[in-house]
Regions:
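A short, conserved beta-strand element in the Rossmann-like catalytic core
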Residues: 92-94, 121, 148-151, 178
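Acidic donor-diphosphate engagement hotspot in glycosyltransferases and nucleotidyltransferases
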Residues: 72, 97, 152-157
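Short beta-strand-to-loop acidic/aromatic patch adjacent to the donor-nucleotide binding site
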Residues: 139-150
Length: 214
């Protein structure tokens, strides 16, 4: 049996690689463990939440997403929350979104919708839609989500609002992917989870750097 031997250079490279691996593993362990510790503290009642439920404006920017609006918007409109409005900014006029939103407004008086002008071609239409939603809002606290997202329950808005305090500037949430079959779906779901854990971990460490609109 032939034994493997390493010269000095190889030993140094091997030691350096092992050290970097350990540092990287400890880095991710400390970062992601913050999420676990936070979740455990919430379950044990060790986290203070606001008892007030301030009025909230929910803003949804939708670009020709009639099917998503049909599937998810009612779940947002029917949240168990004392005072809130839902503002949908419709970007595009090639589907039935406008007709559907107009119909829903007759049933839900707290729903309001507007549109992005077709002449707006040289700026980010998503940013413009969000700006229009903010300008149309009546309340100080703003909640952003997307037409493709569906709340897990009618308590979604309450769970967000309990974090609204005088010391809070931004509340970050997590939006997962529905379970599905296939390697590609699992890869997308994993990437989404990994990204979310990273920005939530940094936020809990006091260094927030990003969030997503879902």
């Amino acid at each position: 049996m032939e034994a493997f031997t390493f010269d000095t250079t190889e030993q140094i490279l091997l030691a350096a690689t092992g050290t970097l691996f350990i540092i990287q593993a400890l880095y991710y362990l400390c970062l992601y463990n913050r999420i676990h510790l936070r979740s455990r503290a919430v379950k044990r009642g060790n986290v203070h939440f606001s008892q007030e439920l301030p009025p909230v404006s929910v803003i949804i920017c939708a670009r020709e997403e009639c099917e998503n609006l049909r599937r998810n918007l009612k779940a947002v409109l029917e949240q168990d929350y004392p005072q809130f409005e839902v503002i949908v900014i419709n970007d595009g006029n090639t589907d039935e979104s406008e007709d559907y939103l107009t119909l829903l407004e007759e049933k839900y008086p707290h729903l309001y919708h507007s549109f992005v002008p077709d002449s707006s071609r040289y700026i980010s239409r998503k940013k413009l839609a969000a700006t229009l939603g903010v300008k149309a809002s009546k309340y100080d606290w703003l909640v952003f989500t997307e037409a493709s997202c569906c709340p897990q329950s009618n308590q979604w808005l309450r769970l967000l609002a309990r974090n609204f305090t005088s010391r809070t500037q931004v509340v970050l949430g997590y939006s997962g992917y529905e379970r599905g079959k296939g390697w590609l779906h699992k890869r997308v779901a994993f990437d989404n989870l990994f990204t979310s854990m990273r920005y939530l971990g940094f936020a809990l460490a006091g260094s927030p750097y990003m969030g997503i609109g879902r």
